[in-house]
């Protein structure tokens, strides 16, 4: 059975645990810009561990939440400076039009970046918008001979509708007839989406961006081309004092809320417990 690579974004005081808790490095662009310790940590790791997989996130979710302006030229500079294995091409949450406009610009930019591969992120507020965005991207990726890599977001509203439209063995396998929480509905909706996407794009590599509930990773081994998954979910639960599996809902926090905080030993221990429990789901 294949191994799904996982990574949980850790607070600053626990960066030393990255290599033992995570299979690869997931670098948040906005933190890289703001925090010198964070930035130097990954610049040094790139030099000392050049073969370790590294993904540079574009921090679209964090920019969306904060309302701060994303400066594309700075992002390009950071890619060339850090030289990650992969970088995530800028997208706009649930906005098909703006995301596709970004994609069209990046068709010209990608060939100028020789040391890293792109991940492209389809977007859309509805299922049809999302699938149309993915189809148009795929057509141009093929025409321009670009890497066939897709990142799939976790937050799109239409995930909540997928379980109403599809009755599949996947849902029965995961949830065993009980009522789903809203977060589980999001997670199940994305599994159903991946069932569709992996059949339409069998030659693509997929990375799963974030999660509303990491129970979904237990079932990603049925999709051969999903290779990696990132989430702050186990850490956010621990910050809230909750063990993974005992939560009623996903905590409404982002990494910026706790990244620079000096955490107690008990919270650190709970973070380690939650991350390892998530990894055990695979």
Predicted features along the sequence, with ranges:
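Serine/threonine-rich low-complexity intrinsically disordered regions
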Residues: 11, 17, 22, 35, ...
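Short, charged, surface-exposed secondary-structure boundary motifs
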Residues: 38-39, 65-67, 130-132, 160-164, ...
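Eukaryote-skewed repeat-based solenoidal scaffolds used as protein-protein interaction platforms
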Residues: 69, 73-229
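Short, acidic/turn-prone active-site loops that include or flank metal/cofactor-
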Residues: 32-34, 60-61, 154-158, 231-239
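Alpha/beta catalytic cores of nucleotide-metabolism and tRNA/nucleoside-modifying enzymes
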Residues: 1-16, 73-76, 111, 139, ...
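Non-catalytic, usually N-terminal nucleic-acid engagement modules in DNA/RNA processing proteins
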Residues: 1-112
């Amino acid at each position: 059975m294949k191994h799904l690579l996982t990574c949980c974004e850790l607070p600053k005081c626990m960066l030393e645990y990255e290599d033992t808790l995570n299979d690869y490095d997931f670098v948040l662009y906005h933190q890289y810009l703001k925090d010198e310790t964070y930035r130097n940590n990954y610049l040094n790791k790139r030099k000392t561990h050049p073969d370790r997989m590294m993904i540079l996130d574009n921090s679209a979710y964090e920019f969306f939440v904060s309302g701060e302006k994303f400066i594309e030229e700075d992002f390009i500079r950071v890619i060339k400076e850090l030289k990650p294995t992969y970088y995530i091409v800028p997208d706009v949450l649930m906005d098909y039009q703006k995301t596709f406009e970004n994609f069209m610009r990046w068709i010209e930019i990608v060939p100028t970046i020789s040391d890293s591969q792109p991940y492209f992120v389809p977007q859309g507020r509805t299922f049809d918008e999302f699938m149309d965005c993915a189809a148009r991207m795929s057509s141009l990726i093929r025409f321009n001979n670009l890497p066939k890599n897709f990142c799939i977001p976790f937050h799109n509203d239409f995930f909540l509708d997928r379980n109403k439209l599809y009755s599949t063995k996947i849902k029965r396998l995961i949830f065993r007839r009980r009522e789903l929480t809203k977060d589980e509905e999001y997670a199940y909706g994305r599994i159903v989406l991946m069932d569709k996407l992996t059949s339409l794009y069998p030659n693509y590599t997929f990375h799963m961006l974030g999660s509303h509930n990491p129970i979904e990773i237990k079932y990603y081994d049925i999709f051969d081309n999903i290779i990696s998954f990132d989430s702050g979910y186990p850490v956010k639960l621990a910050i809230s004092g909750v063990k993974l599996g005992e939560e009623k809902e996903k905590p409404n926090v982002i990494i910026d809320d706790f990244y620079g905080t000096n955490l107690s030993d008990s919270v650190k221990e709970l973070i380690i417990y939650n991350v390892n429990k998530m990894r055990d789901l695979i």
